[in-house]
Amino acid sequence: MNEIFDKEEWASRKQQDREAAYAMVDDTLKKMGTNGKAFQTYLDVQSKFERYSVSNALLVAAQKPEATDLGDANFWRGRGGYIRKGESGILLMEPGNSYTRKDGSKGVNIHIKRVFDISQTTLTPTKQPAVSQDTRLLLNAMVRYAPCKVDFRDELPDGQSALYSPQEKTVFVRRGQSMEDVFRGVAQELAHAYLDTGNYSRENNIFLAQCVGNILCQRNGIDGNSLAVSQLPQKYTEMEPKQLREYLKSIRTAANQISADMFRFLDAKSHGSRQRDDAR
């Protein structure tokens, strides 16, 4: 026997989900402002789900940070799986139609939906293959479309692996390091170049660049523990959640720009290799 659809009850549940999602975002931001581990958890999630907005990465970090593959019930049914009994799902925000406010500005309706990790379904999670790209190739990909020059030096101040100079628009790299050390250093310092929009202070953005470097290491299979966040600088602990969120957007944007540029290089490289193989 089919249940009668109760529109009011449905609307009430949707409103409860909306309020819960927005409260969760605010609570997670507040926690991240004083908890280095919580901040690193967010970076871990953003590294896995690069297409997710800051708000949705915050929601995943708050509800199921170990998630690896997310989709709604219809998505999993399409794969031949079903949601396990008792699983309530993960609240995410989904942009809807745009609208015009009374003051003439544009806005976007936000819908709240529930998604599920593959571990919450009857399907068996498949272990993702480890990134096996050559580190030198990854480095070439990272600097190929960089908005700055890259130069090498025998020594850098304080023995740093790499150093971005806003004045010279150059990332200087210290010679004599392992490829992994160079990757970590360049990933962090290259972030400065992507963040630099003029009158740039490297010192004021060291923490943001560290976060970008950590995300890039995770995405490319490089050990990024030396760039992990254990404690936030004081200025971030004193920020209002809304301001901290803007910094998270800057981190996400820079990390995704570098990742996109790397993909462009690696995809062209792979495409060229396939063409040469076909010609043989």
Q: Could you describe each region identified by the protein language model?
A:
Residues 1-280:
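N-terminal accessory/interface modules of nucleic-acid-binding and processing proteins
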